[in-house]
Amino acid sequence: MRNSSNKYLDLPYRPGVGMMILNADNQIFVGKRIDTKISSWQMPQGGIVPGETPSIAAMREMLEEIGSNKGYIIAESKCWYSYDVPSFLIPKLWNGNFRGQKQRWFLIRFTGNNKDINIHTSNPEFDQWRWTSLDELLSIIIPFKRKLYQAVVKEFESLIQ
């Protein structure tokens, strides 16, 4: 018999994108998730609509999550990164159809200013936002995404001048 903690292993990953958005000072945008009581900071991310390219999805998600798409893509990750969500969350997310996400990540230079950011969108995901340093980023991220974030930071850190 299968261990109940492994009952979701046959589920696929949801295809998505993640954005490491940099301001002019090379600080990274993070938002505090609105749907949890614990302090869950993360970089913007979201799903890919069928027929959409990852780069188009990244710019669309940026607009949907931070209320602005003022920026341009500096780099795209060389591979897809994936993470599993904790098993207790699976039934609550994506109708229980996915075990986690596989994401293409984008390093984006934000060309707007703080006044251009509006997290109070039609479907808000964040209730707070801030700019953080590369050094602080990994310490404030929700633990189940930390390994993915470490890989993304490793790939992009040489491009953050």
UniProtKB/Swiss-Prot annotation:
Its cofactor is Mg(2+); Zn(2+). GO terms for molecular function: mRNA 5'-diphosphatase activity. InterPro entries: NUDIX_hydrolase-like_dom_sf, NUDIX_hydrolase_CS, NUDIX_hydrolase_dom, RppH. A motif (Nudix box) lies at residues 46-67. The keyword Hydrolase applies. Its EC number is 3.6.1.-. It is an enzyme of class 3 (hydrolase). NCBIfam families: PRK00714.1-3, PRK00714.1-5. Residues 12-154 form the Nudix hydrolase domain. Monomer. Accelerates the degradation of transcripts by removing pyrophosphate from the 5'-end of triphosphorylated RNA, leading to a more labile monophosphorylated state that can stimulate subsequent ribonuclease cleavage. Preferentially hydrolyzes diadenosine penta-phosphate with ATP as one of the reaction products. Also able to hydrolyze diadenosine hexa-phosphate and diguanosine penta-phosphate. Has little or no activity on diadenosine tetra- and tri-phosphate, on diguanosine tetra- and tri-phosphate, on GDP-mannose, ADP-ribose, NADH and NAD(+). Optimum pH is 8.5. GO terms for cellular component: cytoplasm. CDD domains: NUDIX_Ap4A_hydrolase_plant_like. It comes from Rickettsia prowazekii (strain Madrid E). This is RNA pyrophosphohydrolase. Signal peptide: none annotated.
